[in-house]
Amino acid sequence: MSEQTQQQNSEEAVENVEAVETVETVGNADGVQEQAAAEPAYEDLQARIAELEAQLKDEQLRALANEQNLRRRHQQEIADTHKFAGQKFAVEMLPVKDYLEMALLDQSGNFDALKMGVQMTLNELQKAFDATQIKEINPKAGDKLDPNIHQAMQAVASEQEPNTVVGVMKKGYTLSDRVLRPAMVTVARKEA
């Protein structure tokens, strides 16, 4: 073979190798593109991870807020239970105070010693009431009737404005802010 033929064959061989490499490169590029299309991109995965982390954080915050609300509600219920724990006792003590006050109003005899003993008992009972936050509801004549703290027992014709207190039959009492017994009152009605 001549040098020229060898050189031509050599050039053709180089061209064939380059053509095969070009085809392989194009084939590999197509394969990479197909593989990339089949799998999500790294950025897409990062975005999904961030989305899931945000969702998890939101759920954690909601659970924490719910727990705090439950704890606060429970503490309030406990505080209310403590605040009104002596209510039954307080209701039972009200008639005792009423009877002692009636005994002090008795002007029939000379019972100074008895009266002094009753007064001392009443003072001690009042101290117990003060210690347990029991307060009197003792409306004055002319006060407007408040159905939350007063109970109208009788309506009488009066020159006072209707639905105002004329007199108190029995004092009312509260424990903290809760009414144990409303004040039993006589109220004014329009004169006929």
From Swiss-Prot:
GO BP terms: protein folding
Annotated compartments: Cytoplasm
Alphabetically ordered keywords of this record: Chaperone, Cytoplasm, Stress response
Keyword Cytoplasm attached: yes
Highest taxon above the source species: Bacteria
Keyword hit for Cytoplasm: yes
GO molecular function terms listed in the Swiss-Prot or TrEMBL record: adenyl-nucleotide exchange factor activity; protein homodimerization activity; protein-folding chaperone binding; unfolded protein binding
PANTHER family (alphabetical): GRPE PROTEIN, GRPE PROTEIN HOMOLOG, MITOCHONDRIAL
Annotated family: Belongs to the GrpE family.
Subunit structure: Homodimer.
Protein's UniProt name: Protein GrpE
